[in-house]
Amino acid sequence: MTRFSTLLWCSLFASFASHAKLKVFVLAGQSNMQGAGQVEMKENSRNGGQGTLAYLVKNEKTAKKYAHLVNKKGEWITRQDVWIRYDDRQDGLRPGFGYRNTSIGPELGFGSVVGDALEEPVLLIKTCW
């Protein structure tokens, strides 16, 4: 059923892209591909959230490097030129496509770089075990 829904979703995406070429990348791997990087964490937990993506976006030493992930209000950006399909989730690329919807994996960095480098729309199909 998952394969069928992936195929169906790809077909629907292709119809939206109409005459444009679509670049498809399959991200396959084991647990590291799933992604356990935390997007956000309560400030009173562990080390005050240091090491989370939210911390990196707000920290003055790293904010510039991660500024492309948030808008002026500090809200996560959902890319409209890079789409991702993972497990039962699909959407424009944004934080939340890791092992859980509160985590990230390599798809976020990869998709950001590839989306910036290519003019065509991008589809990431992530599969891991």
Question: PLM features: what roles do these ranges have?
Answer:
Residues H19-W129:
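Cell-envelope and extracellular/periplasmic
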Residues M1, S18-H19:
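Short, surface-exposed loop and linker segments with low hydrophobicity and enrichment for Pro/Ser/Thr
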Residues T2-W9:
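Sec-dependent signal peptide recognition
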